[in-house]
């Protein structure tokens, strides 16, 4: 389960713009998916938790994912959102790091 931050509607829009499908929603809860990755987004805000939460998503082609991320323009359209280009880290994995509007750090590899 992932916390949405202070604006649940904005969080849902962000993930939809990023390419996630909205599978279903109920008051205060939504399920989103992308390929084989699925998560529940909760209408909950806890800044300390959000700033210390990380999500990991495995993607088939990291470079293609980076191009899709750039093409989505979420980096320009959503305040506080930023990303680091594909980088090979000391632990031997290439990753894209994305900070979502709530401050959660996403690792795509």
What are these regions (language model features)?
Residues 55-105:
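Vicinal oxygen chelate
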Residues 37-40, 47-49, 104-105:
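Short, charged/polar, Gly/Pro-enriched secondary-structure boundary elements
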Residues 27-28, 42-43, 69-75:
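Intrinsically disordered, low-complexity boundary segments flanking structured domains
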Residues 26-28, 49-50, 90-94:
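Short acidic/glycine-enriched loop/turn segments that link adjacent beta-strands
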Residues 2-39, 45:
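Core segments of cupin and vicinal oxygen chelate
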Residues 1, 51-55:
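Short amphipathic alpha-helical segments
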Residues 1-4, 43, 88-92, 97, ...:
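Short beta->alpha transition motifs characteristic of CBS
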């Amino acid at each position: 389960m992932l916390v949405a931050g202070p604006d649940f509607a904005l969080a849902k829009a962000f993930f939809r713009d990023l390419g996630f499908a909205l599978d279903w929603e109920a008051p205060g809860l939504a399920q989103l998916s992308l390929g084989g990755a699925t998560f529940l987004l909760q209408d909950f805000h806890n800044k300390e938790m959000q700033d210390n939460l990380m999500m990991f998503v495995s993607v088939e082609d990291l470079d293609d994912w980076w191009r899709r991320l750039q093409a989505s323009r979420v980096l320009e359209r959503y305040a506080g959102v930023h990303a680091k280009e594909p980088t090979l880290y000391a632990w031997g994995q290439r990753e894209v790091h994305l900070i979502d509007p709530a401050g959660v750090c996403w690792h795509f590899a």
